[in-house]
Structure formats: structure tokens, C-alpha cells
Swiss-Prot record:
Key words of the record: Ribonucleoprotein, Ribosomal protein, RNA-binding, rRNA-binding
This protein's encoding gene: rpsQ
Record-annotated disulphide pairs: none
GO biological process: one example: translation
Pfam family, one: Ribosomal_S17
Family note: Belongs to the universal ribosomal protein uS17 family.
Protein's name in the database: Small ribosomal subunit protein uS17
Gene Ontology MF: a single term: rRNA binding
Length: 81
């Protein structure tokens, strides 16, 4: 089974080897027929501490690394000022 990959913005990179990433998705509400934006925050494993707050990164699903971490940082996209 392929691993899911998502893109999101780093909200916090204060913890050692951990980045909290906000991922936003849009969908059409089934009853209201309006476009709805939903955000989720994921704890991602950042082995080399490369993530910076405000940066857009890609995260990939992985085996559990701790109580909350089930994702790992794959690639950096760039920074948003």
C-alpha cells in the first residue's frame, strides 16, 4: 500500500526533531453545496531539524515513531514570508 504524501505549512518547529505541520484541504459540503476549508495539524518527524516556521513542506506517512508522530518530513518547498 503506497504511503500518503501531503503538503502543509510548518506551524511550530520548537521541539527537537519534530515539526507541527498544518495541512489544509477543501471539499464540497454534501448538503450545502459550498466549498469548505478544513485544516488538520500533524506532528512530523524531522530528523535533521530543517523545518522553519512558515515554510511549506511535504510530509509522508510512516510507522509510528512516538505517541503522536506518524508522519515524517520528506522535502522542503520554500519559505513564505
Amino acid at each position: 500500500m503506497p504511503k500518503r504524501i501531503m503538503k502543509g505549512v510548518v506551524v511550530s518547529a520548537k521541539q527537537d526533531k519534530t515539526a507541527i505541520v498544518r495541512v489544509e484541504r477543501t471539499f464540497t459540503h454534501p448538503m450545502l453545496k459550498k466549498i469548505v476549508r478544513k485544516t488538520n495539524k500533524y506532528h512530523a518527524h524531522d530528523e535533521n531539524n530543517v523545518a522553519v516556521e512558515g515554510q511549506t513542506i511535504a510530509i509522508r506517512e510512516c510507522a509510528p515513531k512516538s505517541k503522536l508522530k506518524r508522519w515524517e518530513v520528506v522535502a522542503e518547498e520554500g519559505t513564505e514570508a
